[in-house]
């Protein structure tokens, strides 16, 4: 296994991915705005993509890069559908805070 990608050690990429993942998880746990929560979920997905690409390059396999392509496509669809739902709820409730979105309550 090659321990360097373009002269940078693999563990640097993995540490960066862990930092990005942690920021994303903290954003999901702390934020109240639905848009910011979606952005935090995108950070989580991008950190996972970074891990896939890192191991794909290190092991000289293309499988990780193919998986990243599909994850990005699914993330784009998730963002489009999620933001459409947030906009629809915002038109009704006049807020995008998830604490105040209680459409399922009577």
Swiss-Prot record:
Its EC number is 7.1.1.-. The keyword NAD applies. The lineage of its organism: Bacteria, Pseudomonadati, Spirochaetota, Spirochaetia, Leptospirales. It comes from Leptospira interrogans serogroup Icterohaemorrhagiae serovar Lai (strain 56601). The gene is nuoK. NCBIfam families: PRK05715.1-2, PRK05715.1-3. NDH-1 shuttles electrons from NADH, via FMN and iron-sulfur (Fe-S) centers, to quinones in the respiratory chain. The immediate electron acceptor for the enzyme in this species is believed to be ubiquinone. Couples the redox reaction to proton translocation (for every two electrons transferred, four hydrogen ions are translocated across the cytoplasmic membrane), and thus conserves the redox energy in a proton gradient. It holds the Pfam family Oxidored_q2. Its main location: membrane. GO terms for molecular function: NADH:ubiquinone reductase (non-electrogenic) activity; quinone binding. Gene3D superfamilies: 1.10.287.3510. PANTHER family: NADH DEHYDROGENASE SUBUNIT 4L-RELATED (PTHR11434:SF21), NADH-UBIQUINONE OXIDOREDUCTASE SUBUNIT ND4L (PTHR11434). This is NADH-quinone oxidoreductase subunit K. It is a multi-pass membrane protein. The chain crosses the membrane at residues 10-30, 35-55, 67-87.
């Amino acid at each position: 296994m090659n321990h360097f990608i373009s002269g940078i050690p693999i563990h640097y990429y993995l540490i960066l991915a862990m930092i990005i993942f942690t920021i994303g998880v903290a954003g999901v746990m702390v934020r109240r705005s639905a848009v910011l929560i979606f952005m935090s979920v995108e950070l989580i997905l991008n950190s996972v993509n970074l891990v896939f690409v890192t191991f794909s390059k290190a092991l000289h396999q293309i499988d990780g890069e193919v998986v990243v392509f599909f994850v990005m496509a699914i993330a784009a669809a998730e963002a489009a559908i999620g933001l459409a739902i947030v906009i629809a709820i915002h038109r009704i409730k006049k807020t995008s805070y998830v604490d105040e979105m209680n459409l399922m309550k009577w």
